[in-house]
Amino acid sequence: MTIATPEIQQRVQQLRQQLQKANYAYYVLDNPIMEDSVYDQLYRELQDLESQYPILITPDSPTQRVGDQPAAQFNSIRHNIPLYSLENAFNLQELQKWEERWQRYDQVSNSDYVCELKIDGSALALTYEDGILIRGVTRGDGITGEEITQNVRTIRSIPLKLTLENPPSRVEIRGEAFLPLNEFDRLNGERKQAGEPLFANPRNAAAGTLRQLDSKVVSERRLQFFAYTLHLPEDNSLSSQWESLEWLKKMGFLVNPNCQLCPTLEAVADYFRHWETARHDLPYMTDGVVVKINDYALQNQLGFTQKFPRWAIALKYPAEEAPTRVKEIIVNVGRTGAVTPMAIMEPVHLGGTIVQRATLHNSDRVSELDIRVGDTVIIRKAGEIIPEVLRVLPELRLPNSRPYQMPSHCPECGSTLVRPVGEAVTRCVNSSCPAILRGSVVHWASRDALDIRGLGEKIVSLLVENELITSIADLYQLTPEKVAALDRMGTKSAQKLINAIEGSKRQSWPRVLYGLGIRYVGNVTAKLLTDNFPSVEVLSQASVPTLASVYGVGEEIAQSVFDWFKIVENQTLIEQLKIAGLQLENIASQAVSLTPSSGNIAGKTFVLTGTLPTLKRNEAKALIEKAGGKVTGSISSKTDYLVVGEEAGSKLAKAQELGITQLSEADLLKFLTN
């Protein structure tokens, strides 16, 4: 065996320290201190030295994250301290009752709380001796878990060696391993290409990954880990949960940056309400908030029930997945002629609302699910207005059920349905189809388009059924007398609607273009186009290459706009709208350039709050990101700008407290183009 000289030993130690610092900076601080190429070079040097001098290999070496051989099986390990479940609260009233309960139990009047986002992953218990990771164990049943140390080593945000000069002789760290959403999408994309079953959600993917016998597979899936508590059997110097979180950071762990110390239950409620919406901007799944009494002495006094700690509770968000039964399958024809199958279901509570229908997207999805009337299904709502069917439970299927067949003819007009080559969507191509007309008019009247108050789906349906309109332009030929003759429409209501329609003539050219409903043209794209093509005449004469040359407009959008203006019926519509007096060109005061300039935005961090006057939140986010900026969901010292709309929430107060610059939508648009 080759003997390692003191110089070699020193070099190995230097390499390990440099690589460990780089790992900590990259995975925990999110602040890289080393180029990838430099890291790879140092890693390879350490690997070569350890290969030449195996006696120098230690468990905390960065090269030992991935084991050479798959494990034959996992051993069961009994937890020194049980990993208890948490009692659940499903609304703020139940949270209030929990506080009243523990206060009665201990006769204490108040306490501050630590709020932590409840990560949807797998709980782990990690044991360190003299600062070195020696064991990683799953939660299991809370009493006994599986030892998966070899897999735990592959998680880059778990330090193999604690970053303390004098680490405790023994400490147990607890936290949650999870799969970030971008990794979940990547993993399922790869599995789909390989013809493998898809993971239902990131939690299942994380749990399945941790139980892989081959740690190389685990390493490739890029799990993350948030630490949330520690147990020091030989030291009781820590006095609070908040202090423990600070210690975890010093030890080299990634602690969720969105944890918050709340002085009262009202502050806890504010935290919960904020994240109920803001969680959809996070890069990982969270299904609630964990609320803990901060003071350890009080925790010890309260103790545990047989199942739960009395000093903590999980405040869950309204369910976003739920089972229900399919009563009927129908198809809906939209304004573009797209035929969307819909499942009509028994009512079920989901995401805080009662849901009775869910989208099935298209015929391919119907075939993939093999969904049938009478089936029990799991439906999901993750921020969408209309929930979707996630999966069917075939084991509960009725014996006489029949596969669903998509219709061959439009249920509205009877025309033969077509499926264009290369598309998943079946369409009705009859431009006179009542469903297409209804959808087009509703879109034209929508808030982001012409904003015609009072012209909703019911009134539009009456106008179409009574043949008072056959196109958008016919709206401007309506009279109060014709409208008043409709069911449940009196003279006053009719005049009010006519006034709203007349007022829509003053809406800007960008809104009119968006209202036309050209495929792929959202309101941001409409602003981009009308900035570069100041009138309908200029836009309608533009070639595909000219259209595509506009920043933010690609070939697909350009082709769609070009094709729309070549259709005779659409040319007629434009002429009728001109005669009616609609704004089909930019007025000088309306012309606002939306071509982002990366000079002012690149590298800056933005947070959005409240409702913006014209831009939707995802559109503002897209504009910022196109210009090289970053949009996050919460305020911190790293935030450069807060974009403020109407009904701004707690983010505004926090930004003012931190001295962060606030921008209106107008400020943002100027900033983008300056």
UniProtKB/Swiss-Prot annotation:
Disulfide bonds: none annotated. CDD domains: BRCT_DNA_ligase_like, LIGANc. One of its GO terms (molecular function) is DNA ligase (NAD+) activity. Residues 596-674 form the BRCT domain. NAD(+) binds at D36, S37, V38, Y39, D40, S85, L86, E116, R139, E176, K292, K316. Keywords: DNA damage, DNA repair, DNA replication, Ligase, Magnesium, Manganese, Metal-binding, NAD, Zinc. It catalyses: NAD(+) + (deoxyribonucleotide)n-3'-hydroxyl + 5'-phospho-(deoxyribonucleotide)m = (deoxyribonucleotide)n+m + AMP + beta-nicotinamide D-nucleotide. Belongs to the NAD-dependent DNA ligase family. LigA subfamily. This is DNA ligase. It comes from Rippkaea orientalis (strain PCC 8801 / RF-1). The gene is ligA.
